[in-house]
A protein has these predicted regions:
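Bacterial N-terminal signal peptides that target proteins for export
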Residues: 1-8
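Bacterial signal peptide processing site
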Residues: 20-22
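Electrostatic cytochrome c docking/interface patches
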Residues: 26-49, 61-66, 83, 87
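Short Fe-S-cluster ligation motifs
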Residues: 81-99
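Axial heme c-ligation environment in periplasmic c-type cytochrome domains
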Residues: 100, 106-126, 141-165
């Protein structure tokens, strides 16, 4: 029995010794390393795609395969030129949500909210700083301004957990896309009928 224990301890010692001499594998650049501007923009595009920003911030066009993002209006938010159809009178206010067909506007118990213009035009985020953009995502502050109202649903609140590097990458990408002029209507509280 003692021989078996000694053999087991010796084997364990040799395994641990073998592990000690192993060199760590090469890792991908850490998030806190400084990225080149092109890589930051590429990372930002990746994040915008993965997070589904265009799902709500890009008007859709109907195709043979169903609705698709209208890339000529990429990330311009609710198209103010189209207006919002009226909420049907037979639909009572309640704990439900109605979306415009292209998902750029939502009506619910909080009121009516519109997807913002994320392009670098001055009617979008063109004049924003990285600090404002970070505050908008982290603290859900409208336009990233300290004393502003909260951003309204359906804007996801879990974006607050993005890293500083991911937010900077998203911001860099958004600042690199085509600027589109589009003044999005302001939020309307539930007592105000939706604009049509």
């Amino acid at each position: 029995m003692r021989l078996k224990i000694n053999a087991l301890l010796t084997a364990l010692f040799l395994v641990l010794l073998a592990c000690k001499d192993q060199k760590p594998t090469e890792t991908v650049a850490m998030a806190n390393d400084t990225m080149e501007p092109e890589n930051l923009i590429d990372r930002g595009k990746y994040m915008v795609d993965v997070l589904g920003c265009a799902d709500c911030h890009t008007p859709k066009k109907m195709t043979a395969h169903g609705p698709e993002n209208d890339m000529s209006r990429y990330l311009m938010g609710f198209d103010s030129a189209e207006g919002l159809p009226p909420v049907p009178e037979n639909v009572p206010m309640g704990p439900w949500v109605l979306f415009k067909g292209d998902l750029t506007a939502a009506v619910g118990p909080w009121g009516t909210s519109y997807a913002g213009n994320l392009t670098p035009h001055e009617t979008g985020i063109g004049t924003w700083t990285l600090e404002q953009f970070t505050k908008a995502l982290r603290e859900a502050k409208y336009k990233g301004l300290e004393d502003s109202r909260p951003m309204m649903p359906p804007m996801p609140r879990h974006y607050a957990y993005l890293t500083d590097e991911d937010i900077a990458a998203i911001f860099s990408y958004l600042k690199s896309i085509k600027p589109l002029e589009n003044v999005v209507p302001g939020y309307q509280p539930p007592s105000t009928p939706p604009k049509s």
